[in-house]
């Protein structure tokens, strides 16, 4: 089979205005970024049409280093739905350069289920990430300048919370010292970099309903505390307007196309392990304005992306998914059943059977939100008929729908069975109205503990002294009603990335809290999760090159 990039190049792309017209977007509302990419103004969203559209969330079992293929299934489902005559649009997150050149590779799907032009989407795309990076670091520069220019007046901050961001994986930038050298270089202080998808600006962009809301949220960003313990925000800095200007184009959803020429919105890109892991509300609602069926995905496993999709994105936007599809693979389940990474392609029914406990736990969790759930088995070449039959029988016993997805190899044709099951399930047994894990009025600790005990399976949650002090501060600031966003490893229900399966009765330790006052959520950091990833021993960058003007090795 051809590589992803070879398949992408073999597709004859439609002009983006043609794609826009095919779903009902007027040509004069399309802002071209080249021939095959466009931005669509957010004012085209029609809330009445949004209410009538069928929103489908695609999530997955707990992530493994073997990969699950959630984005490929999301795109494949959209292709399959279009194949059976439904007007379906997929709404995804934008890829980050860090993982693209690091361990994970690109994030535009795979095989014959991709969003295109793949190379541009995986690299600089429409510049949204660069705009977010610039906006975030502009705040850093303006804050440092404010402190420098006003130090003679006796002004200073007791604690500076605002760090810097960069869209690369670089462990050496996690903790730095700025302002070294002569006094004219600014005030010497500790700082550090997070990766751009972890930026509060990214979360704000993805949760904003329009430019005015974007500006309001930017104004509320908490930068630090004065010596008399008063919060110091972007509003105090007086630059919310300038920062909003840097994001005025980035807020508009991006329109591209799939390998079969159908519409796709790709916009926003927070990670689900260190942020809330969902594409922008605006892109989802734009897709729902023009599509009868809209497929969106949330990052990593259902314990991370799906939980945050429901408890944060849906809570803030009023979105109500009609169905949740959970992606499972034989290889991933075998890893959760104790099979080593180097042996997961070998037949192993016992390992697969043991790994099903991970799937079961996710399905129970999804049901707790009132969701109707179906399982999409993402087929790999090494999968056996016996393994697929075992999973089918297990889903039957669970009382959840099951379909095989082979869109990677066959495009939309390989997802027709899944598409038919999705339509049939939505028509006969759609999800109930969302039942959130916690209430707005619950305390921060109650929210964290409800997620940790009810969804992760923790028996106890412990807090560092730093965390307890910040929780007290949150209560004093009157923002305890914000939802919580737990940052933890994607490889386990626990905070230990080496504990696979369906672990229960463990201690979850919250070592720190980050107050995202602009994004209006509380980020609780569990375990040793890093908001700036490092590169692996053999980064993907070693395999990427350009030969005769053509990019190679991008996947």
UniProtKB/Swiss-Prot annotation:
NCBIfam families: PRK13505.1 (NF010030). One of its GO terms (molecular function) is formate-tetrahydrofolate ligase activity. InterPro entries: Formate_THF_ligase, Formate_THF_ligase_CS, P-loop_NTPase. Belongs to the formate--tetrahydrofolate ligase family. Pathway: One-carbon metabolism; tetrahydrofolate interconversion. It catalyses: (6S)-5,6,7,8-tetrahydrofolate + formate + ATP = (6R)-10-formyltetrahydrofolate + ADP + phosphate. Keywords: ATP-binding, Ligase, Nucleotide-binding, One-carbon metabolism. ATP binds at residues 64-71. Signal peptide: none annotated. Gene3D superfamilies: Domain 2, N(10)-formyltetrahydrofolate synthetase (3.30.1510.10), Formyltetrahydrofolate synthetase, domain 3 (3.10.410.10), P-loop containing nucleotide triphosphate hydrolases (3.40.50.300). Its EC number is 6.3.4.3. PROSITE patterns: FTHFS_1, FTHFS_2. It is an enzyme of class 6 (ligase). GO terms for biological process: tetrahydrofolate interconversion. The keyword Ribonucleoprotein does not apply. It comes from Bacteroides fragilis (strain ATCC 25285 / DSM 2151 / CCUG 4856 / JCM 11019 / LMG 10263 / NCTC 9343 / Onslow / VPI 2553 / EN-2). Coiled coil: none annotated. HAMAP family: FTHFS (MF_01543). This is Formate--tetrahydrofolate ligase.
């Amino acid at each position: 089979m051809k590589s992803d990039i070879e398949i992408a190049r073999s597709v004859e792309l439609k002009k983006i205005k043609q794609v826009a017209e095919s779903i009902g977007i007027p040509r004069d509302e399309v802002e071209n970024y080249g021939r095959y990419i466009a931005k669509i103004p957010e004012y085209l969203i029609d809330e009445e049409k949004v209410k009538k559209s069928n929103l489908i969330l695609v999530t997955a079992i707990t992530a493994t280093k073997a990969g699950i293929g959630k984005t490929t299934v999301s795109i494949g489902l959209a292709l399959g739905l279009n194949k059976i005559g439904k007007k379906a649009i997929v709404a995804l997150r934008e890829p980050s350069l860090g993982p693209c050149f690091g361990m994970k590779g690109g994030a535009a799907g795979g095989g014959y289920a991709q969003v295109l032009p793949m190379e541009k989407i995986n690299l600089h795309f429409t510049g949204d990430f660069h705009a977010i990076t610039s906006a975030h670091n502009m705040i850093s520069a303006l804050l440092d300048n404010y402190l420098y220019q006003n130090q003679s007046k006796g002004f200073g901050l007791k604690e500076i919370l605002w760090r810097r961001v960069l869209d690369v994986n670089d462990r050496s930038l996690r903790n730095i010292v700025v302002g070294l050298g002569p006094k004219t270089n600014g005030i010497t202080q500790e700082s550090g970099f997070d990766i751009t998808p972890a930026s509060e600006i990214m979360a704000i962009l993805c949760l904003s309903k329009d430019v005015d809301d974007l500006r309001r949220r930017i104004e509320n960003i908490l930068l630090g505390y004065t010596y008399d313990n008063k919060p110091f925000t972007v509003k105090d800095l007086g630059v919310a307007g300038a920062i909003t200007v840097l994001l005025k184009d980035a807020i508009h959803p991006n329109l591209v196309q799939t390998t079969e020429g159908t519409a796709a919105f790709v916009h926003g890109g927070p990670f689900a392990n260190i942020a809330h892991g969902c594409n922008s509300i605006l892109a989802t609602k734009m897709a729902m304005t023009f599509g009868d069926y809209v497929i969106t995905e949330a990052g990593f496993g259902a314990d991370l992306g799906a939980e945050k999709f429901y408890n944060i994105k849906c809570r803030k936007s009023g979105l109500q998914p009609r169905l949740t599809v959970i992606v499972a693979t034989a290889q991933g389940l075998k890893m959760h059943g104790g099979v080593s990474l180097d042996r997961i392609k070998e037949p192993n029914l016992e390992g697969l059977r043991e790994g099903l406990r991970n799937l079961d736990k996710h399905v129970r969790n999804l049901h707790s939100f009132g969701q109707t759930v179906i399982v999409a088995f993402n087929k790999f070449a090494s999968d056996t008929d016996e393994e697929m039959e075992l999973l089918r029988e297990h889903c039957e016993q669970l009382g959840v729908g099951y379909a095989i997805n082979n869109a990677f190899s066959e495009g939309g044709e390989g997802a027709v069975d899944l598409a038919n099951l999705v339509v049939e399930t939505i028509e006969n047994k759609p999800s109930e109205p969302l039942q959130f894990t916690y209430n707005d009025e619950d305390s921060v600790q109650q929210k964290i503990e409800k997620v940790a005990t009810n969804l992760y399976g923790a028996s106890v949650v412990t807090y560092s002294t730093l965390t307890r002090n910040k929780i007290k501060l949150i209560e004093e600031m009157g923002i305890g009603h914000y939802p919580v966003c737990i940052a933890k490893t994607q490889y386990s229900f626990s905070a230990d990335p080496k504990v696979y399966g369906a672990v229960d009765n463990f201690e979850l330790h919250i070592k720190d809290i980050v107050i995202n006052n602009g994004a209006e959520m509380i980020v609780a950091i569990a375990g040793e999760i890093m908001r700036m990833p490092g590169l692996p021993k053999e980064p993907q960058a070693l395999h990427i090159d350009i030969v005769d003007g053509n990019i190679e090795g991008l996947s």
